[in-house]
């Protein structure tokens, strides 16, 4: 079973380290993680690159979002941008927030549920 996580991020430098480490330290790794950098103006992109440099299954792509503020719109557009950039099909696609900290066996549990 192939599982991909898409994580839209915007100015998450205060949270991204713990989030990335919680994904990297999973008992079962996802097949791919795509961070969609949605025009961050802080060090979010650099931190993602630094913490994930040894994980070839973690990628970051840049999305140029519109400046117009409509609550919830930017994150949906960033997620859809990530979906459009998938090169292969996945059985499960998850959308997580950039500040999420996952329990160590979270991905394993997700895969097990879908395999039942």
Feature-to-residue mapping (PLM):
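Cell-envelope/extracellular polymer assembly enzymes that use nucleotide-activated donors
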Residues: 2-4, 32
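Short beta-strand/turn micro-motifs composed of small residues
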Residues: 7-9, 37
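Short, well-formed alpha-helical segments that are part of the catalytic scaffolds
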Residues: 12-25
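Acidic donor-binding segment of Leloir-type glycosyltransferases
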Residues: 24-67
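A short, glycine-/small-residue-rich helix N-cap motif at loop->alpha-helix starts
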Residues: 66-77
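Active-site nucleotide-sugar/metal-binding loop of Leloir-type enzymes
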Residues: 76-92
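Short beta-strand-to-loop acidic/aromatic patch adjacent to the donor-nucleotide binding site
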Residues: 89-101
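Conserved donor NDP-sugar-binding/catalytic core segment of glycosyltransferases
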Residues: 101, 105-116
């Amino acid at each position: 079973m192939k599982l991909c996580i898409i994580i839209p991020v915007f100015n998450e430098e205060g949270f991204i380290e713990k989030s990335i480490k919680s994904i990297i330290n999973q008992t079962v790794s996802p097949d791919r993680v795509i961070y969609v950098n949605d025009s961050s103006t802080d060090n979010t992109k650099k931190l993602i690159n630094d913490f994930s440099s040894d994980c070839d299954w973690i990628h970051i792509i840049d999305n140029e979002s519109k400046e117009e503020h409509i609550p919830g719109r930017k994150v949906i557009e960033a997620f859809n941008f990530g979906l459009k950039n998938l090169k292969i099909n996945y059985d499960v696609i998850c959308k997580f927030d950039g500040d999420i900290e996952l329990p160590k066996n979270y991905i394993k549990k997700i895969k097990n549920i879908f395999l039942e």
